[in-house]
Swiss-Prot record:
Binds 1 Mg(2+) ion per subunit. Changing Q444H: In strain: IFO 14297. Substrate binds at N116, T166, K170, R288, H320, S372. Gene3D superfamilies: Ribulose bisphosphate carboxylase, large subunit, C-terminal domain, RuBisCO large subunit, N-terminal domain. Heterohexadecamer of 8 large chains and 8 small chains. It comes from the Bacteria. It comes from Nitrobacter winogradskyi (Nitrobacter agilis). PANTHER family: RIBULOSE BISPHOSPHATE CARBOXYLASE, RIBULOSE BISPHOSPHATE CARBOXYLASE LARGE CHAIN. GO terms for biological process: reductive pentose-phosphate cycle. This is Ribulose bisphosphate carboxylase large chain. Mg(2+) binds at K194, D196, E197. GO terms for molecular function: magnesium ion binding; monooxygenase activity; ribulose-bisphosphate carboxylase activity. The record marks K327 as: Transition state stabilizer.
Length: 473
């Protein structure tokens, strides 16, 4: 082995961290960054700087480089690509050796890949577009506490999407009135009701009171309908200790599912809660509150497909994914891409859906995709088509806004869903024939007929801010 020598000074990043001839290993963690460089900084130097600063490099040569094998540990920028339709930025592909990261710690992966490098002056803007976990790393992570099949078996619900509802108004109700709203929606035909992301333990409704009244509602609805029901009890709390206290109480009162805000609450807390749920037979619903602060800017931040991909090994049985047709951001192609990343065992590279790498999840179970945000009965045919069976379709205002009340709103959604599932089984095209399918079902359901009348003019037709960059073919 050649003797290493030390020369003080500053060298260009590209001398060590730009390797266009590098062939990524099966064990490498791969990342695709969208880089907008500062004026005067060439592509290779900016990409190499990102590789260095997100792995083991720094701004100057240090003598302690001689004490390790940098050729083994360093990140390597190995490919650059143009961004279709945008000449201000480009894609940089970087490979990281697996031994740079603690096993089973998505927290540690994020600390490097989206850490201080995002404030680096050599780049004007930086966005993590995609990430590939090698199967060797996937095997060290806990993943969803239970997954799709186990949840269906626990609830005895098969062959259709599940139906949910976020209780509104999201803030201000007393615990007793909150529980009453849950009961009406559950007895009307929903599978789940849900705490909104910002319901924790406020003066108007303390968490223990809410848990008690809600579980009374769940159990009463189960007795009346003969179906398993649930409510996502949000255990997100000021401290991990308080979070586990709330989770333990949910278990004590026989709740089947709890909820966590994984970005606001933190990935460390989320992984710990997922482990607790796995060990205690509790399902875990994940809300993505705060995601748009991170992912909506198309040039700086983290794409939501990465936030989806990081959640799966961290742990969650459900994840909010947007709706395509509702009030929240998300185009159809991209949404289908990250739904697959959440649910499928293997997802191949597909640039038409924004997927830059093959992703093999091995035997790690998948989670339910949750569609929520501005949806109502008219959206049902499209939602069933887009999301398929392994999803939870959550109608908040689209349940509670029914003129006849929560139970009628829930019943309308259940009738619409079952009509779409039946029509799909008959080979009908749900999106093309949706109006006819719903109209026929409404002839036998006054609740659905009124719901269709109420929301027939409601649309959310705004331009998507974060669009797929796909070359014209």
């Amino acid at each position: 082995m050649a003797v290493k020598s030390y020369q003080a000074g500053v060298t260009q990043y590209r001398q060590s961290y730009w390797q266009p001839d590098y062939m990524p290993l099966d064990t490498d963690i791969l990342a695709c960054f969208k880089i907008t460089p500062q004026p005067g900084v060439d592509r290779e130097e900016a990409a190499a700087a990102v590789a260095a600063e997100s792995s083991c490099g720094t701004w100057t040569t240090v003598w302690t480089d001689l004490l390790t094998d940098l050729d083994y540990y360093k990140g390597r920028a190995y490919r650059l690509e143009d961004v279709p339709g945008d000449d201000t930025c480009y894609y940089a592909f970087i490979a990281y050796p697996i031994d740079l990261f603690e096993e089973g710690s998505v927290v540690n992966v994020f600390t490097s890949l989206v850490g201080n490098v995002f404030g680096f002056k050599a780049v004007r803007a930086l966005r993590l577009e995609d990430l590939r976990f090698p199967i060797a790393y996937v095997k060290t992570c806990g993943g969803p506490p239970h997954g799709i099949q186990v949840e269906r078996d626990k609830l005895n619900k098969y062959g259709r999407p599940l139906l949910g509802c976020t209780i509104k108004p999201k803030l201000g109700l007393s615990a007793k009135n909150y529980g009453r709203a849950c009961y009406e929606a559950l007895r009307g035909g929903l599978d789940f009701t849900k705490d909104d992301e910002n319901i924790n333990s406020q003066p108007f409704m303390r968490w223990r009171d809410r848990f008690d009244f809600v579980m009374e509602a769940v159990q009463k609805a189960e007795q009346e309908t003969g179906e398993r029901k649930g409510h996502y009890l949000n255990v997100t709390a000021p401290t991990p200790e308080e979070m586990y206290k709330r989770a333990e109480y949910a278990k004590e009162i026989r709740a089947p599912i709890i909820m966590h805000d994984y970005l606001a609450g933190g990935l460390c807390a989320n992984a710990g809660l997922a482990n607790w749920c796995r060990n205690n037979g509790m399902l875990l619903h994940i809300h993505r509150a705060m995601h748009a602060v991170i992912d909506r800017n198309p040039h700086h931040g983290i794409h939501f497909r990465v936030l989806t991909k990081i959640l799966r090994p961290s742990g969650g049985d459900h994840l909010h994914t947007g709706t395509v047709v509702g009030k929240l951001e998300g185009d159809r192609a991209s949404t289908l891409g990250w739904i697959d990343l959440l649910r499928e065992s293997f997802v191949p590279e597909d640039r038409s859906r924004g997927i830059f790498f093959d992703q093999d999840w091995g035997s790690m179970p998948g989670g339910f995709a949750v569609a929520s945000g501005g949806i109502h009965v008219w959206h049902m045919p499209a939602l069933v088509t887009i999301f398929g069976d392994d999803s939870v379709l959550q109608f908040g205002g689209g349940t509670l806004g029914h003129p006849w009340g929560n139970a009628a709103g829930a019943h309308a959604n259940r009738v619409a869903l079952e009509a779409c599932v039946q029509a799909r089984g008959e080979g009908r095209h749900l999106e093309k024939e949706g109006k006819d399918i719903l109209t026929a079902a409404a002839a036998q359901s006054p609740e659905l007929k009124i719901a269709m009348e109420t929301w027939k003019e409601i649309k959310f037709e705004f331009e998507t801010m974060d669009k797929l960059a796909i070359a014209n073919k």
